[in-house]
């Protein structure tokens, strides 16, 4: 059986697609798998502000189109790039084991975020990061930074930059990290650190394959986070964050953040994994009511 996996062409995206390929081959050694690189709008406008050109869905739109046209069988995405609502007719039956959901501070000049001098310049284009950085250090000067991970790492004109730790691990760049930021300083993006695999909702054969390699603990955790995002109708324009962590085999601890331009709000709660989705929705309703 030939399976075509669609992915963006960036180095990180290809590494993630290869990870998914290996997981499939470990479980189904007789599969023949082809990686298909697809250029997305997010790649074409690599230096533009995502919120201004249409949001993070630009990283998956063209890949979803290839899925819907039956040109590929499945698509591998960074889950944090998948918007709250994606194309009708598609589903995500699989999330691979999640790596660190944390953000990392990288600096060639300073030892930590806290030790930065007054008015230091930090580069990041994520509004979620900007809001939380200024909540931690209101004096900081936050400037935009776009491009792939390699491009961002090459830019040394700032006091520091913020990147996802998981991406650096996958690219074997973890040694460049100055400081891993704890959730109390920088709560992560929904799904950060997780790779998801998307396919057609009616493709039973592919769904069966993907369910075999799904990491159920990661799947349930990110389901709670995405439920929060859907409830607040979050997008690239919305400063939001959520992180679900296991406190026991069957209990999740969820922390969420939502900002409205004036204030930043946090909430937390714990529930059994069976109620993960409801917990995310309840958190979303609470914070949404505060932002009205």
Swiss-Prot record:
Q: What is its EC number?
A: 2.5.1.61
Q: Which molecular-function annotation in GO is an example for this chain?
A: hydroxymethylbilane synthase activity
SUPFAM superfamilies documented for this protein: Periplasmic binding protein-like II (SSF53850), Porphobilinogen deaminase (hydroxymethylbilane synthase), C-terminal domain (SSF54782)
Note on cofactor: Binds 1 dipyrromethane group covalently.
Could you state one GO cellular component term attached to this entry?
A: cytoplasm
Keyword Glycoprotein listed? The answer is: no
The record's listing under Gene3D superfamilies reads: Periplasmic binding protein-like II, Porphobilinogen deaminase, C-terminal domain
Q: What does this protein do?
A: Tetrapolymerization of the monopyrrole PBG into the hydroxymethylbilane pre-uroporphyrinogen in several discrete steps.
Recorded protein name is Porphobilinogen deaminase
What species is given as this protein's source? Wolbachia sp. subsp. Drosophila simulans (strain wRi)
Q: What is the lineage of its organism?
A: Bacteria, Pseudomonadati, Pseudomonadota, Alphaproteobacteria, Rickettsiales
Give me the gene this protein comes from: hemC
């Amino acid at each position: 059986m030939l399976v075509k996996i669609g992915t963006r062409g960036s180095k990180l995206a290809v590494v993630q697609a290869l990870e998914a390929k290996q997981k499939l081959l470990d479980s189904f050694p007789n599969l023949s798998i082809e990686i298909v690189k697809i250029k997305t709008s997010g790649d074409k406008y690599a230096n533009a502000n995502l919120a201004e050109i249409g949001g993070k869905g630009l990283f998956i739109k063209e890949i979803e189109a290839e899925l819907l046209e039956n040109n590929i069988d499945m698509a591998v995405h960074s889950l944090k790039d998948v918007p709250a609502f994606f194309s009708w007719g598609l589903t995500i039956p699989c999330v691979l084991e999640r790596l660190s959901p944390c953000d990392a501070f990288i600096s060639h000049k300073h030892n930590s975020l806290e030790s930065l001098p007054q008015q230091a310049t930090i580069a990041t284009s994520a509004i979620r990061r900007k809001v939380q950085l200024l909540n931690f250090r209101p004096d900081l000067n936050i400037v935009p930074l776009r491009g792939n991970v390699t491009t961002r790492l090459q830019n040394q004109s700032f006091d520091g930059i913020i990147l996802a730790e998981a991406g650096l691990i996958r690219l074997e760049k973890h040694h460049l990290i100055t400081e891993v930021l704890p959730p109390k300083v920088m709560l992560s993006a929904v799904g950060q650190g997780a790779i998801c695999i998307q396919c057609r909702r009616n493709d039973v054969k592919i769904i069966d394959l993907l369910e075999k390699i799904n990491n159920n603990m990661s799947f349930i955790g990110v389901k709670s986070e995405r439920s929060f995002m859907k409830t607040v109708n979050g997008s690239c324009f919305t400063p939001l964050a959520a992180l679900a962590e296991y406190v026991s085999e069957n209990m999740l601890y969820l922390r969420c953040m939502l900002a409205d331009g004036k204030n930043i709000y946090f909430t937390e709660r714990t529930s059994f994994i069976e109620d993960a989705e409801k917990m995310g929705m309840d958190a979303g309703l609470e914070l949404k009511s505060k932002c009205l």
